[in-house]
Structures are given as structure tokens and as C-alpha cells.
Amino acid sequence: MESQQLSNYPHISHGSACASVTSKEVHTNQDPLDVSASKIQEYDKASTKANSQQTTTPASSAVPENLHHASPQPASVPPPQNGPYPQQCMMTQNQANPSGWSFYGHPSMIPYTPYQMSPMYFPPGPQSQFPQYPSSVGTPLSTPSPESGNTFTDSSSADSDMTSTKKYVRPPPMLTSPNDFPNWVKTYIKFLQNSNLGGIIPTVNGKPVPPMLTSPNDFPNWVKTYIKFLQNSNLGGIIPTVNGKPVRQITDDELTFLYNTFQIFAPSQFLPTWVKDILSVDYTDIMKILSKSIEKMQSDTQEANDIVTLANLQYNGSTPADAFETKVTNIIDRLNNNGIHINNKVACQLIMRGLSGEYKFLRYTRHRHLNMTVAELFLDIHAIYEEQQGSRNSKPNYRRNPSDEKNDSRSYTNTTKPKVIARNPQKTNNSKSKTARAHNVSTSNNSPSTDNDSISKSTTEPIQLNNKHDLHLRPETY
């Protein structure tokens, strides 16, 4: 029947039947789809006449242009203007290929799916860098491709795209066993070096820093080493500060590096529970883990400082008792809130050990009271402090004149010390020697004078000598 129908169209050769569907040489108004080979032979002549007399759309507009039809005489057809599919509704080639791949003429020409890479190795772009993926995603590098005879390692196109241009570096193989992890880390470090990231891998004795986390209890110390590792990698600006905010905003590449290094050096089975809780919500939120770790380190430092302060308390009344009580109670409350419980007995012993001065006797008056509380101890401290303040206020504030104190000191010395005869100030002007003085005395005794009579009057009276020769004799010496 197909041969009979084709004989009705003298302009169409049997070899170019497919090309005639879109050819401009079709002069009939009959739809070629109505006379296809799928039609049965029961069509009569009446139905054929009815179909031929109908005013239908030209055959060229009913079938869209097929650019890839294997026709020996391809013919170009202008886009339809009045067919059932308007021109503005037809898909363009770019719309049909949103991924931007080259258009393949035959399904057999489409290549197989490329090597499945871990999401952390995706090239930079608008796509998500951290999609969730199961552990089964990805294949080892040794796995052959779907096409026989071609493997990923032997693909020249892959080598030219990934290794020769250095735009994308071949990722390390998939880790399949915990026992292979040491060797896999070496491969990963080699991958970083090939990615021009070898300068950010500090080493100590040939081993990468930070060390591997091997226990949840070692996580606080490991985080300190990891933060030092980031600082050595010129990433100190993204580390959260005391207020929990970094100095600068982290970039996507830095976040990728942060995620990869944390995942390598801190295996999930060795993470503490609170770290796992954060990763269960967002497994890429490494910044939150660092922020919480810094807060815990500060809290641990504060706890150590509080314990040292409480063990070395000293009080002698030089500061107000209220300030001393506030300081001690705040330290005890902080330690109790952080899980370090200080009971009343221990607290009272630490407080009483630091008391001195008038407060020292509290060690002995209260030592028998086993149920004494910190509040009761501070009641006694307040009582002593108020008594000290009252005694200081009752003392007179009069200050003696310095001149009065000077006069009192003079009179005191005159009454206690024996009176000393002062020498004549003219002594310094007398330059006579002792021999000359003796000669004068002897001559004065031989010569008659009234002074000799006064000397010989009585031996019991004190001897009085003129002060002519500056001689002074004490009566008790004779």
C-alpha cells in the first residue's frame, strides 16, 4: 500500500521519502502523516477524498525541522508561521541543553558519565560546594569506565583537562579502610602540593601539623594545635576572637580548606559529643566549633584562676568587708556553675586560712563548728570590721604643735642629763700654752697682792680663781 501511495506523488522519489517531509517541493495540501505506513488498508476512497478536500496546515509546518536526520538531500525549511506550535513556543538549542554541553546528533555519541568526584573537589562556581552524599558515592581511581577499554587513568582528555593545565588536580583515591588511612593521608598531602597548596602544610620532623586526634578527651589540646596550624597558614584572620566574631569574612575557598583539613585530622569517631551535635545540624560549620572551643578554653582558664585566687585569699581589714565578701562569693558561684562544687566546709577553711591581724582568732573560735556556713563566717568578719571602724572614729584627731614637742624634748634633756659647764667662748682667742699659764700662776703667788689674802683665808671654802687665765676647778677635786 505504501508503494501505491507513493506513486500518487510523482515529484517524490522512493529514496528521498524522508527528505520530502520537510521539502519545499510538496504541492499538495494532504497531510503526509495521514498516508504513512502505519495506516491500514481499510481506508476507502471516500475518506481519502474527504481528507484531500480539507483545508489543512501545510505538511512542512506540521513536522519540526530535524537537523540531524540522515537524509541524502537535506533541505532547509523556514520556521513555521501559522502551525499548531507558534514560533515563540519552540525550544531553542540552548534551552534544550541548559548544561552547556555540545549537542550530539545521535544518542550513541553521548559519552558516559564522568568520574564521580567528592563534592569537596568540585571546581569553583555557583554550585553547592558541600552537598550531602552517601558513603557509596564515588569510585576508586582504578575502577574502569562504562566503555570497555577506556579507564580514567588512560583518558588523554582527562589528563589534558586536569593535569596539564593545572586547573583541576586529580583527587586522591577513596578511602576504603581505616587501616589505609596513614597511606591515604600521604596521598592527600601530595594532592595539596599538586594544587599549589604545599606551602600551607607545615611539618615538624616530617609529620604534618596538627597531629591526628586519637581521643575525645584530647580535643581541647588538639584544637589549640589546629588554631596554631591555621595561623601558620595565613588564616589567623578567620579565627573567632573573644567576642566570637572573626576579624574578617571567610571566603568559600577558605571554608573548603577549613572543612577538608578538619575532616582529615579530626576523625568523626574521636570527636566529643558537643562537636558531633554541631555537625549533625550543619556538617560544614567548623567556625562554630572553633568559637565554642575558644569559649571553653577561656572558661577553663577562668576556672583555674578562680581556684588559685580562692586558695590564696588574704584579708586583714585593709579593705571593706563587703568588698571581700562579694569577691569570695562570686568566685564560689562561678566554680559551682562550671561544675566545680565548693561546699561550705572547704570554703570556710580557705577563707579562715587567709585571715590575719585581729581576724586571725576566728580560726580558733570557730574551728569546732563543723556546720558553719560561709554566711555565718562573714557575719563575724563584719562584726570585727565595724568594731575597728568605730575605734578609729573615737580616737582624738588633735595634733600637737611641732614647736611644743621641741620645747618638751629640750626640758626633758636638761632634767635628766647632768649640768655641764660651758667653756668661755673666748677660749678660741687664747693662744697661750700650758707652760706659760703655769709661769703666770707662780709669779702671781710670789708677788704681794690682795688675791693672795683671799686664797689663804680658809681652806674649807671653795677656791675661787679669777678667770684671768681661764682656769676652772671643781671643788670636789680638792
Swiss-Prot record:
Residues 337-439 are annotated as: RNA-binding. GO terms for biological process: viral translational frameshifting. The record marks 439-440 as: Cleavage. It is found in: Cytoplasm. Residues 153-165, 440-456 have a biased composition (Low complexity). Transmembrane segments: none annotated. InterPro entries: TYA. Residues 1-84, 126-174, 390-478 are annotated as: Disordered. Keywords: Cytoplasm, RNA-binding, Transposable element. GO terms for cellular component: cytoplasm. The C-terminal RNA-binding region of CA is sufficient for all its nucleocapsid-like chaperone activities. Retrotransposons are mobile genetic entities that are able to replicate via an RNA intermediate and a reverse transcription step. In contrast to retroviruses, retrotransposons are non-infectious, lack an envelope and remain intracellular. Ty1 retrotransposons belong to the copia elements (pseudoviridae). Capsid protein (CA) is the structural component of the virus-like particle (VLP), forming the shell that encapsulates the retrotransposons dimeric RNA genome. The particles are assembled from trimer-clustered units and there are holes in the capsid shells that allow for the diffusion of macromolecules. CA also has nucleocapsid-like chaperone activity, promoting primer tRNA(i)-Met annealing to the multipartite primer-binding site (PBS), dimerization of Ty1 RNA and initiation of reverse transcription. This is Transposon Ty1-H Gag polyprotein. It comes from Saccharomyces cerevisiae (strain ATCC 204508 / S288c) (Baker's yeast). The lineage of its organism: Eukaryota, Fungi, Dikarya, Ascomycota, Saccharomycotina. The gene is TY1A-H.
